[in-house]
Amino acid sequence: MAAITASMVAELRAKTDAPMMECKKALTEADGDLNKAEELLRVKLGNKASKAASRVTAEGVVAAFIDGTTGALVELNCETDFVSKNDDFLAFSAKVAELVAKQNPADVAALSALEIDGVSVEATRTALIGKIGENMTIRRFARYANGGKLVSYLHGTRIGVMVEFDGDEAAAKDVAMHVAAMKPVSLSAEQVPADLIAKERSIAEQKAAESGKPAEIAAKMVEGSVQKYLKEVSLFNQPFVKNDKQTVEQMLKAANTTVKSFTLYVVGEGIEKKQDDFAAEVAAQVAAAQKG
């Protein structure tokens, strides 16, 4: 049985808004697995438990570059919020985004071998680490060069969106802002990844089973929950953030605009922040001193 620490309970509470005791019970049942505990709470408390599922812990920036119909969106990570605002780090991020758009590297390793002002990206990164005194990495990038129109939207430097479209640029820009705010996972319900659907279905089945309803009604509850989820996470089905009386699809149709694809990056999304156990560290130091 894994030890359930106060910091684990606090982290789960921050993610879910669930009562402390419920968080502790869920962690105990999940044997200390935070992700599993969050799922258990979602089953018990409903979707409120997922309100902060996208809250991130790692620091860094998202940078964008567009030149005509070619563009790139990149995420670079660092250790602290302070460094994410550093001028040298921001300038490096902007140059990396431009390099991705113009040179079309296959992956981060290939990107690292390209040059900025005659010096490799990797050497530039290493020099910047030495100058600033903090580790930083190029995490991911998306490149567009399909001949379609492009717009980007940056919410500060922590959320970045690129949209490929045909039609009205103002409408496409509105879609980019909408994506940053509502965080859809796909264009349409049909494109939602199967693993996400399976996860939602599993949660819905557990909730339906606990409801004690007859099998036929429970099955309808499950299907209803899944369909509701698909509408909530697919861009075209979402209520438009600037006018919730119409869906994004309806807004685009009225503007005679087609969105072909989009990329959304949220800084640190999916990265677990290291939690220091100072009590254990002190105990280890004391033990080492006693041995000495």
UniProtKB/Swiss-Prot annotation:
Residues 80-83 are annotated as: Involved in Mg(2+) ion dislocation from EF-Tu. Keywords: Cytoplasm, Elongation factor, Protein biosynthesis. It holds the Pfam family EF_TS. InterPro entries: EF-Ts_dimer_sf (IPR036402), Transl_elong_EFTs/EF1B (IPR001816), Transl_elong_EFTs/EF1B_dimer (IPR014039), Transl_elong_Ts_CS (IPR018101), UBA-like_sf (IPR009060). The keyword Iron does not apply. GO terms for cellular component: cytoplasm. NCBIfam families: tsf. HAMAP family: EF_Ts. Belongs to the EF-Ts family. Associates with the EF-Tu.GDP complex and induces the exchange of GDP to GTP. It remains bound to the aminoacyl-tRNA.EF-Tu.GTP complex up to the GTP hydrolysis stage on the ribosome. This is Elongation factor Ts. It comes from Cupriavidus taiwanensis (strain DSM 17343 / BCRC 17206 / CCUG 44338 / CIP 107171 / LMG 19424 / R1) (Ralstonia taiwanensis (strain LMG 19424)). The gene is tsf.
